[in-house]
């Protein structure tokens, strides 16, 4: 029986988020090899990969406030663009360039490991409305999965009907794609071994989060270390809780991608880190 899994490796896992534009190439290679190994031994696994922008996209996005957007003028207005608007769109293009640059490193690692993967940039296929996906032509993703190709998406700039432009994280994209494709599992690999009740002390691991228990943990769940314009850990958990309430059969894991073999272990069904489920 075929199983569809979404796997994200966070920007903090594949870049040094404290050093702008610094890819962690050895780690990318290791992750790619783990994915290749798993696909060879699990012929029924269908995989969609997403990755964060790390120290590539987040630096420029923070400088230019790209996620907040710049409201579109009426098409009936004839006016010169002011300096603020010019600067916004300059930043929009810069974030696109940096996010795409990181994606090339990821794709190189996957292809070096003989993973049949293709990049499907959200900037060329997604339209947002007020920071959420409103239009996405997902047929290439579906056809890729049918051909046993691994579609790769990533945190990217997109045009927005209200804001003009914005940034969508991989989790933002998964929010839409999970409703369209109904994966059995979503795996979020990062630096943290789990979600912590007392971040940044990291002494109280949360084994499981459900909609009923989230409130008791939410105060201690922290943001990400380093630049992150898309919300950090608490935002990720909240988004995944929304998805498990939409699809009660969905299971989400948040775990460390730095430990040897963890990608293989989770892809093949082992439970690591923190689990998010409906009950």
PLM segments and residue spans:
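Nucleotide/pyrophosphate-binding catalytic subdomain
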Residues: 1-262
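Short, basic/aromatic-enriched C-terminal tail that caps enzymatic domains
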Residues: 262-279
């Amino acid at each position: 029986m075929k199983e569809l899994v979404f796997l994200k490796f966070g920007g903090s896992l594949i870049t040094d988020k404290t050093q702008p534009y610094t890819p962690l190439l050895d780690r990318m290679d290791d992750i790619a090899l783990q994915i290749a190994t798993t696909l060879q031994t699990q012929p029924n696994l269908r995989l969609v990969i997403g990755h964060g922008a790390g120290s590539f996209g987040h630096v420029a996005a923070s400088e230019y406030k790209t996620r907040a957007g710049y409201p579109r003028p009426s098409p009936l207005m004839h006016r010169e663009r002011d300096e603020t608007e010019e600067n916004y769109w300059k930043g929009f293009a810069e974030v696109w360039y940096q996010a795409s640059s990181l994606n090339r490193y990821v794709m190189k690692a996957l292809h070096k490991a003989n993973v049949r993967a293709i990049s499907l940039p959200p900037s060329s296929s997604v339209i947002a409305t007020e920071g959420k996906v409103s239009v996405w032509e997902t047929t290439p993703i579906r056809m890729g999965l049918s051909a046993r190709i691994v579609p790769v998406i990533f945190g990217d700039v997109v045009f927005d009907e209200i804001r003009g432009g914005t940034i969508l994280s991989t989790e933002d994209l998964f929010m839409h794609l999970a409703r369209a494709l109904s994966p059995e599992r979503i795996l979020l690999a990062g630096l943290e071994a789990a979600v912590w009740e007392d971040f940044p002390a990291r002494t109280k691991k949360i084994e499981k989060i459900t909609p009923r228990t989230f409130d008791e943990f939410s105060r201690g769940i922290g943001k990400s270390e380093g630049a992150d314009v898309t919300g950090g850990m608490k935002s990720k958990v909240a988004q995944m809780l929304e998805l498990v309430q939409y699809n009660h059969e969905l299971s989400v894991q948040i775990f460390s991608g730095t430990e040897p073999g963890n990608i293989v272990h989770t892809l093949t069904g082992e439970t690591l880190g923190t689990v998010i489920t409906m009950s």
